[in-house]
């Protein structure tokens, strides 16, 4: 009986230590979410401004630009999957990968090859474990993305988009990431990056008119300058949304783990007390039995 009590004491001690770790990680994630959300909000003015500029150029100009023109036949599609570097974030990365798998099945059903690009060690581990190929991977800092990384990813995707099919080029580019809606709601999302589909995060009302531009010297040159920056801003916005979603998912996961640890501690404490009470009862019974034996 004493050994059983010691086991419960050890379980209570180890679970209490884990609860402290969970609580610390929850507090860290909570403190970082505010910064992540602030970065998302700070990126919106630039993203919306360049989106409106690209929309105005594309809508007011009769041009045939490779980044805005739908190809006659789409033979190969690129899919960029944005997950986390670290775990302990509940089903965050698993939900993104599930969304990516659904997109892959859809593209294959349409007769398209799929060329995959990865962001985050979780997606890399997922593909490595299944011996599946991917073109490139970027890891490090998924919970605090830098614009330089978005620029590097954008350059790689644009290079493959401009390349010929025989050289590994792609005809369209999709991005799979997690859209941050609120602290309790994050939604795995797919967007088509190229050919251009202008999507403004906070669209203006229908009564607002797009600005009128005079192009100097040529409209194509304006698009050549704007579109790469537009792609970079869309990628960076997706990475910032994913980072905020990752931290929110980790905060919820750690809170849930801490609550479960508290429940386990209560359970083990109750079992320990029951075992201790049984031990005391047994000892008293033995004492009474011994006294009765001596009296007789």
UniProtKB/Swiss-Prot annotation:
GO biological process, any: proton motive force-driven plasma membrane ATP synthesis
Topology in membrane: Peripheral membrane protein
GO terms under cellular component: plasma membrane; proton-transporting ATP synthase complex
Superkingdom field: Bacteria
Keyword Cell membrane in annotation: yes
Self-association and partners: F-type ATPases have 2 components, CF(1) - the catalytic core - and CF(0) - the membrane proton channel. CF(1) has five subunits: alpha(3), beta(3), gamma(1), delta(1), epsilon(1). CF(0) has three main subunits: a, b and c.
PANTHER family registered for this protein in UniProt: ATP SYNTHASE GAMMA CHAIN, ATP SYNTHASE SUBUNIT GAMMA, MITOCHONDRIAL
Protein name, as recorded: ATP synthase gamma chain
Gene: atpG
């Amino acid at each position: 009986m004493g050994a059983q009590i010691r086991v419960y004491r050890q379980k209570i001690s180890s679970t209490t230590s884990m609860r402290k770790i969970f609580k610390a990680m929850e507090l860290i994630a909570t403190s970082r979410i505010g910064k992540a959300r602030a970065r998302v909000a700070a990126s919106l003015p630039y993203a919306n401004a360049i989106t409106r500029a690209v929309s105005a150029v594309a809508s007011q100009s009769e041009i045939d630009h490779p980044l805005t023109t739908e190809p006659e036949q789409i033979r190969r599609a690129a899919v960029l999957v944005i997950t986390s570097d670290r775990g302990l974030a509940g089903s965050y990365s698993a939900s993104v990968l599930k969304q990516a798998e659904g997109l892959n099945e859809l593209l294959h059903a349409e007769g398209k090859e799929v060329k995959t690009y990865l962001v985050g060690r979780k997606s890399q581990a997922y593909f490595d474990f299944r011996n599946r190929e991917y073109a490139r991977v970027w890891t490090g800092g998924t919970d605090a993305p830098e614009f330089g990384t978005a620029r590097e990813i954008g350059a790689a995707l644009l290079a493959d988009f401009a390349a010929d099919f025989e050289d590994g080029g792609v005809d369209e580019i999709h991005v799979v990431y997690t859209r941050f809606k609120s602290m309790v709601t994050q939604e795995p999302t797919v967007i088509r990056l190229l050919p251009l589909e202008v999507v403004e995060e906070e669209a203006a009302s229908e009564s607002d008119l797009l600005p009128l531009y005079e192009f100097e010297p040529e409209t194509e040159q304006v698009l050549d300058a704007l579109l790469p920056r537009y792609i970079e801003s869309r990628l960076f916005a997706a990475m910032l949304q994913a980072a905020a979603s990752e931290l929110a998912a980790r905060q919820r996961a750690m809170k849930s783990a801490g609550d479960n640890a508290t429940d386990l501690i209560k359970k083990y404490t109750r079992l320990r007390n029951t075992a201790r009470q049984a031990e005391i009862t047994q000892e008293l019974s033995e004492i009474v039995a011994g006294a009765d034996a001596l009296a007789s």
